[in-house]
Amino acid sequence: MTHDLATQLDSLHDVNVLVVGDVMLDRYVYGRTDRTSPEAPVPILNVEQQEVFPGGAAAVAAFARQLGATVSLVSVTGNDSDSRTLRRICDEAGVDTSAWHTEERRPTTRKERFIGQASGRHGQ
């Protein structure tokens, strides 16, 4: 069975894939939470690091490309910095974004995750 899976994955080098769907920019923001806001009982995050990744259909396209397929991505984003960042990431991954449409009146979808480590606690 493992041999069959390896053979199938190797065969992706000969496959053309068209991905159509909603793309988004996934942003992870990491930091420390050393204090709580005086206005509300919420922690204040001191940002130490940020990472961005393709999300949604862009993630599917990037994964297919990593497996060796030739990938074209069709989607719509806004005309903003998140769109440019997402397109750059996809282009660098080898995904064809020539059918990507930019719409002036809409924002690019961005999903942000804020991950804080409390002071005095061990990381997991």
Annotated model-derived regions:
Residues 21, 75-78, 116:
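Short beta-strand/turn micro-motifs composed of small residues
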Residues 1-34:
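Positively charged, low-complexity intrinsically disordered leader regions
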Residues 26, 80, 121:
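Flexible, glycine-rich phosphate/dinucleotide-binding loops
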Residues 21, 56-57, 123:
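Glycine-centered small-residue hotspots that permit tight backbone geometry or close packing
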Residues 102-106, 111-124:
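Conserved phosphate-binding/catalytic loop of the ribokinase/pfkB sugar-kinase fold
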Residues 2-9, 16, 38, 42-110:
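Substrate-binding N-lobe of the ribokinase-like
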Residues 30-39, 116-118:
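Short, flexible, mixed-charge acidic loops at enzyme active sites
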